[in-house]
Each structure stands twice: as structure tokens, then as C-alpha cells.
């Protein structure tokens, strides 16, 4: 970690203090994760400008979730306790290709220090936000070549949702509070999804005409977006 910090022009702390993060989902058999701050306030120079490296931490990995069913969760312990170098940047990247470039540069730095690399060993979380939008975290991105496309699609999604929001406001749209029971009405439906449901409820989306089917990103509609929240 000290070598990594130097390669990222960081200020190394005078003393390393081990902290405990409580873990309550069972992925750490001790009930907590050991972590500590190694360095702060670094930077990388990229073709798109300087990117600030806020912090470099050292922590231990958790167990890997295998399956959850019938109220029980199974974990694999093969990576439990493995040291992790956690690198955090500030929000100074403004182009999808810059995100990929920074990820590549970080990978090269880690490679030079013999840190284990490759799919499954390096996990990157992307925090994406735009003007008028919300910050969205996409966890566990592993493929460098997909990174710019992931950022592009999330920006596309947020821009589409902002446009829909403005249109709904212009229409004075609203979601009516009353919940309707459709079990009897749809008793003879041919829809397999509705047939398999224990019960069918509905609400009136006043002013949403024509927007539910609007695409917010390839393969995802506004209706899919609403369904994700409902689930």
C-alpha cells in the first residue's frame, strides 16, 4: 500500500489505526471488518486533466455470498480476510472515456506492485451524477472495456428520466392514492405473469399517458423503472 500511495502522489499517514466496521449480514464470521487509512490527498494526471485520489485504505475482504433461500444464506470462505487495497477518487471525472482511462492507470499501478488483478479480484464501484439528476452507484464493475458504455447508459437513463419528470410536471400528473383490487376482473386473464400472482393490485397514474413505454436506455423502459422501485 505504501508503494501504491507513492505512485499516486499521496500523503502517507504518520500512524496506521485499525478500525472495525460492523458487518451484520453474516459475510464476516467475526461480525466486523478490519480497515484502516493508509494515505490521502493524491492525484493522477490524465489526458483529460488531473484526477484527485481522495484516499487509500487497507481492509480485509468478506466472505462470498453463494445462495440465499428459505431464510438461510450460504457463504464461501475462500476470500475471507484477504487484504484489499481500497482506492477512492473524488468526482473530478467528466467524460466516460476518462473514467476508463483512470481505471486503466490504477490497474497499471497495481500491476507494478504485484497486487492480484483480473476479473473477480478487482472490483470497481462507479458513482455517476449529472445536473438535475441523482447520484447513482453501480457496484462491482469488473470489465474495463465496458466501463465507458456503462457510464454512457446511466447518463442516458438519467437524462431521459429528467425529461419525463419535466413532462409530468407540465401535465400536472399524479399517482392517485386509492389501490384497486383486480383479482376478480382479471380472473380469466391469459397472461402467465398475472396468473401466477397471488393477488393483483393497481393504482391510477393520472397524466402518464404514453410515457410508460418510453425507453430510458436500451432495453429499459420507464415502466421497467417504476417496476424496479415497486419490487
Residue ranges of model-derived segments:
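Basic, nucleic-acid-interacting segments
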Residues: 1-231
Amino acid at each position: 500500500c505504501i508503494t501504491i500511495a507513492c505512485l499516486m502522489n499521496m500523503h502517507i499517514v504518520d500512524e496506521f489505526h485499525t478500525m472495525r466496521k460492523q458487518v451484520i449480514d453474516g459475510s464476516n464470521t467475526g461480525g466486523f471488518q478490519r480497515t484502516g487509512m493508509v494515505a490521502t490527498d493524491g492525484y493522477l494526471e490524465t489526458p483529460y486533466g488531473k484526477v484527485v485520489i481522495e484516499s487509500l485504505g487497507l481492509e480485509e475482504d468478506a466472505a462470498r455470498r453463494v445462495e440465499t433461500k428459505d431464510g438461510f444464506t450460504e457463504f464461501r470462505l475462500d476470500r475471507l480476510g484477504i487484504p484489499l487495497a481500497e482506492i477512492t477518487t473524488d468526482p473530478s471525472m467528466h467524460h466516460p472515456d476518462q473514467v476508463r482511462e483512470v481505471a486503466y492507470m490504477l490497474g497499471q499501478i497495481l500491476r507494478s506492485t504485484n497486487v492480484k488483478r483480473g476479473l473477480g479480484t478487482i472490483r470497481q464501484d462507479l458513482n455517476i451524477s449529472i445536473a438535475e439528476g441523482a447520484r447513482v452507484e453501480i457496484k462491482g464493475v469488473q470489465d474495463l472495456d465496458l466501463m465507458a458504455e456503462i457510464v454512457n447508459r446511466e447518463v442516458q437513463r438519467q437524462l431521459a428520466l429528467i425529461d419525463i419528470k419535466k413532462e409530468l410536471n407540465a401535465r400536472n400528473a399524479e399517482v392517485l392514492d386509492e389501490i384497486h383490487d383486480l383479482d376478480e376482473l382479471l380472473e380469466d386473464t391469459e397472461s402467465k405473469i398475472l396468473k401466477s400472482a397471488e393477488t393483483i393490485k393497481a393504482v391510477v397514474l393520472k397524466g402518464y399517458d404514453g410515457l410508460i413505454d418510453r425507453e430510458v436506455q436500451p432495453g429499459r423502459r420507464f415502466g421497467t423503472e417504476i417496476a424496479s422501485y415497486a419490487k
